[in-house]
Amino acid sequence: MIENKVELVAELVLESIGKTEVVSRHTEGTKSCQVSFRIKDSPSEKGSTSFLSELVVIQTLDDNDKYTVVIRHGTSITMACVVGYSDFKLPTELKWPLERESLPVEPDLKPIMTQLKRQTAGSADMPKFDDEYQAQARQNQGTAPLNPYPGLTVTEPSFANPAGGYADGDLYPVGTSHPDWSGGLPNPLGNPSSQGGMIFDPNRRPAPRREDMPPGWMPGSKYDEPFGPGSGGFGGSGSGGFGGSGSGFI
């Protein structure tokens, strides 16, 4: 039989631990309760049948509905906390004494995750992701193996995709990924028929514009917007630099 709140709190703490076997109980009035118990089905040590633990529940001095809970095993404290009487799922009114078998032991927990709403499939004309490497198109090029390095010029005759990599005209000096050095160094101003390309310019002075100096800014090739400040647009002299006339790259 449970005579008061401190015994009830001790019983509820034991229920929250799991299957326990009470060895002894000792209650001092309505202020403290001491319980020695073993946890059932716990791994045993050599020379002992199971772990013997001790639960101590003490009512705090400043609040009658707050209790200090301490669980220790030997000289080691495994848990120490303060719990409130209202933290447990209990009826609004309790009639003393209580039967131990009729204690509410189910926790009052609400599900944290809710079921996500299933998204409906979009229409056929809804745009998909930006397929800059033509990944979707390459799936329909037959049974030949695909290049495992999309965007690079690494290729083999057995690969279905062409040898040219993505954006070769922009990523490589003078607009080509494999320039022909047999005729000497290429023209630093670029081939007039070339589409241009980015190239490191050690002589370029950093522009004072903030858009040219984002976090982590490094000197070198920068893209100058075709219709922005300093750009000549299509066909003009612009600020093409090494990339060629009007290329937009400086």
UniProtKB/Swiss-Prot annotation:
InterPro entries: PI31_Prot_C
Source superkingdom: Eukaryota
Region of interest called Disordered, as start-end residue ranges on this chain: 179-250
GO biological process, alphabetically ordered: chromatin organization
Annotated GO MF terms: proteasome binding
Keyword Protein biosynthesis: no
Keywords linked to the UniProt accession: Chromatin regulator
Biased composition regions of type Gly residues, renumbered to the chain: 229-250
Residue ranges, compositional bias (Basic and acidic residues): 202-213
Note: Present with 358 molecules/cell in log phase SD medium.
Family of this protein: Belongs to the proteasome inhibitor PI31 family.
Assembly and interaction partners: Interacts with the 20S proteasome.
Its biological purpose: Plays a role in the establishment of transcriptional silencing boundaries, preventing the propagation of heterochromatic silencing.
Protein name as annotated: Silencing boundary-establishment protein FUB1
Originating species: Saccharomyces cerevisiae (strain ATCC 204508 / S288c) (Baker's yeast)
